């Protein structure tokens, strides 16, 4: 990271790297890290350990000002206030079916959040899409606080990621599904209204669980 003199870090997986790259090809101030696929050991090594290493390195860097991680909609400890019991049960079921992935993602999300909150002026972005499709980008989304289950195209996720990075002073968790609102309008609305889907999570507990820099 020091060698590249990057200002932003994007931690993503698979085809997101290429999709985000296409949208940011004119910029030279960012670095993309790849998320992991495979068995539990690889998931922990990449989605948890390597990601946390990059988070800590980014926050210790003198040049990096933003870190965006592509997480998952169900990656949270507590029920979102805008979800009903059925929605929360559905999210928990997803996490129980993929426990290693869930725990790895949550550890990375909470590390970025806890440490990002403690560094003044640092932009931390936890982008949390639902189920992913390879369909053509739609350009219409549900963003900020969404229902607990749904689909979104990878292209739409990449587009939202770029729009968030291009804004100043963005911090927080942002849920994302396909929807009916134009992408530009949705992003502007959520940032203007200060919507953060971390609401309901225990930030102080995160800070206690995460070792300081």
Name each region found by the language model.
Residues 1-61, 165-168:
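NAD(P)H-binding glycine-rich loop region in Rossmannoid oxidoreductase-like domains
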Residues 16-17, 61-66, 71-213:
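Oxidoreductase cofactor-interface core, primarily capturing Rossmann-like NAD(P)-dependent enzymes
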